[in-house]
Amino acid sequence: MKNIRNFSIIAHIDHGKSTLADRFIQFCGGLELREMSAQVLDSMDIEKERGITIKAQTAALQYKARDGQVYNLNLIDTPGHVDFSYEVSRSLSACEGALLVVDASQGVEAQTVANCYTAIDLGVEVVPVLNKIDLPAADPERISQEIEDIIGIEAVEAVRASAKSGIGIEDILEEVVNKIPPPKGDPDGPLKALIVDSWFDNYVGVVMLVRVIDGSLKPKDKIKFMATGAEHLCEQVGVFTPKSVQRPSLNAGEVGFVIAGIKELKSAKVGDTITLVSKPATEALPGFKDVQSQVFAGLYPVESHDYEALRDALEKLQLNDASLKYEPEVSQALGFGFRCGFLGLLHLEIVQERLEREFDMDLITTAPTVNYEVVMKDGTVEVVSNPSRMPEAGKYDELREPIITSTILVPQDYVGSVMTLCNQKRGVQRNMQYMGRQVMLTYDLPMNEVVMDFFDKLKSTSRGYASLDYEFKEFQSADLVKLDVLVNGEKVDALSLIVHRASSVYRGRELVAKMRELIPRQMFDIAVQAAIGGHIIARETVKALRKNVLAKCYGGDITRKKKLLEKQKAGKKRMKQVGNVEIPQEAFLAILQVGDK
């Protein structure tokens, strides 16, 4: 066991984590040259394209160190994005050490700080590495000072490397061997193995990525999951080099995969503990929790007969992504669809994109919302995530909205504008620290405001330099109202919003003005109104057309006419009938563009 090293890489998006992993694999001969592809560990196309890592992956590498011994290095790749923070904490708790990779030209970012603190809390040894040292803009002296100022770990001796050109790769591996402690565990005790990740394979069912803490596991063992109590027969175990290689057993301290013929991911939850039925462990490993959805949105097929196909697609996605939740819902405006729960906005975007790309779905997405707690007159508390399900104004005592604690790292020049933005979003400042050239702001913000467009605005006010990390804090009572949109006197449920009373009139006016631009003119006047309860607060009118001007095709080629007709047909397909007015897809997205004052 003393020659095993388990480590992961902590880095902000785009600081070169996956490229570094590729170099390790190449250096240790994990794959032959012809099998190398850029970003070997990012297996989804969308991961490669956006340059982000979503699922954790591993590689078991053999490294012959300068002291002549051969070490088994287990690299566990972690996602770097704030939406996937639970997956990160599980990956880190499977390791004894972590490489903190920082871009030598960009410096430390908020998500790096958050993940690094997670690592330190879990007692993981953090080894700093400065990457992209060959860039003309690299300034290693300043950045190592920044690491010390912000995170507070020694960084003077940080390895300087460039994953792209392969500089300093061996030095990093030496650091891993020398600085990171070997795993501790009892090889003969009862089996305890942590599920770091799990995914679905079409041939063998669920594949679990585990880190064995105590004991050992071999095929034909009967295993038990401690959180769910389910029992299964272990069929095969092995390691990834990144290709999968079967092994006769997995022992204490090792990281590998377990296949046990499990049909669905729900049974193999990330963070759960596996033990043997014959010799069970007394208590599970700490830190397991069920992941809760934070952001909700409605997904509707453009064509109503695609409903079944959308359900199948969501089921398949859920096989690989246990944090995606969905339930059927009906909207008067959009027909049948699903209400889906996500970890955050990035997660929502990724799911939407995968549905469109991998399953070829045409979707209409409603504006994202969050969970609200409604305290009814009789004292019961209901959780509502869909504005159109919100009870009438007189039926409840108070409304509570989720508050998050956000940490924003921003260069000093932009502090003023970022603070103004946070105040506009009803934020409460909790803390402010100067660290070198950066400032760390801590704010309590209503999640409702963050979901809308906070991230984009934060990036634009700080010219892209600010970075954000957040976690849920509590539900807090607030003066919120439900804003309805009426088109021709009929409520359009998919356009309902929950807003703060102070900004409701402004939001209503803006939304109605936007809708007026987007609703095509008909043969009659259309009234577009915004209402709170029975009280109309804003109105715009879409003026009627005088006559139809489709008379420009006199003679001419039939294909030309066909083309125009086809084009019109495609446009019609994307629109949905509401009463007697067609509302285009853009109108449902208009909610997102309605800013605050």
UniProtKB/Swiss-Prot annotation:
The keyword Transmembrane does not apply. GO terms for cellular component: plasma membrane. It is a peripheral membrane protein. Its EC number is 3.6.5.n1. It comes from the Bacteria. Signal peptide: none annotated. The keyword Cell membrane applies. Transmembrane segments: none annotated. CDD domains: EF4_II (cd03699), EF4_III (cd16260), LepA (cd01890), lepA_C (cd03709). GTP binds at D14, H15, G16, K17, S18, T19, N131, K132, I133, D134. It is found in: Cell inner membrane. It is an enzyme of class 3 (hydrolase). Its main location: membrane. Residues 2-184 form the tr-type G domain. PANTHER family: TRANSLATION FACTOR GUF1 HOMOLOG, CHLOROPLASTIC, TRANSLATION FACTOR GUF1-RELATED. Belongs to the TRAFAC class translation factor GTPase superfamily. Classic translation factor GTPase family. LepA subfamily. This is Elongation factor 4. The lineage of its organism: Bacteria, Pseudomonadati, Pseudomonadota, Betaproteobacteria, Neisseriales.
